[in-house]
Amino acid sequence: MAFFSSRVRALFILVLVLPLCSETGFARSKKTRKEPDCDVYRSHLFFCTREMDPICGTNGKSYANPCIFCSEKLGRNEKFDFGHWGHCREYTSAARS
């Protein structure tokens, strides 16, 4: 009976831990992701969800997700493009010189 309970315990732990491990394996790499298609957001600028999928623009600003990035790019007079996926790095004045 002790063998059975240890086997059930191991299976229970596996069922709890497996989803946590497998979700990270499905995340797309920053290097393999393509630039967002801003034409998708053209008809509804600034009507964006609050999901976090950060984008760094060439203007050095971080945008929370592709919708906000594209809305700012298409709806403002500023000229900037897609830099990379993820937050922009903040540089100190000492690092720039």
Curated annotation (Swiss-Prot):
Gene3D superfamilies attached to this UniProt entry: 3.30.60.30
Disulfide pattern: C38-C70, C48-C67, C56-C88
Domain Kazal-like as annotated: residue spans: 32-90
Summary of the tissues where the protein is detected: Seminal plasma.
Cellular localization per UniProt: Secreted
Pfam families attached to this UniProt entry: Kazal_1
Signal peptide range in chain numbering: 1-26
Protein name: Sperm-associated acrosin inhibitor
